[in-house]
Amino acid sequence: MKILVVCGHGLGSSFMVEMNVQEALKQLQAPASIEVAHSDIMTASPEMADVFICGRDLEENAQRLGEVIVLDNILDKTELQEKLEAKLKSMNQL
């Protein structure tokens, strides 16, 4: 399984959220086989990952990708972990 964090340019904010996703996966004791990466929203495509994560500002553009976790606040680690846990449970990954 692969998770792709996307932002406008694929640099700072998506990289920061990627690191937070990795931390959340450890805390959730998720399978080590789950991969996490980051990219810009424009080059992201549905076949690049099973789950995509983005901020609320990119929600409309990200809908074309498939399974998307939308964060109201990309700095909120609690929100990220709660939404990630719910998504992974719904996909039988936890």
Regions found by a protein language model. Give the residues of each.
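Short acidic active-site motifs
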Residues: 39-44, 79
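Structural signal for conserved beta-strand scaffold positions within catalytic alpha/beta enzyme cores
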Residues: 5, 38, 54, 69-72
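Ser/Thr/Gly-rich flexible loops in soluble cytosolic domains mediating phosphotransfer, phosphorylation
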Residues: 68-94
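Alpha-helix N-cap/helix-start motif
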Residues: 14, 61, 77-80
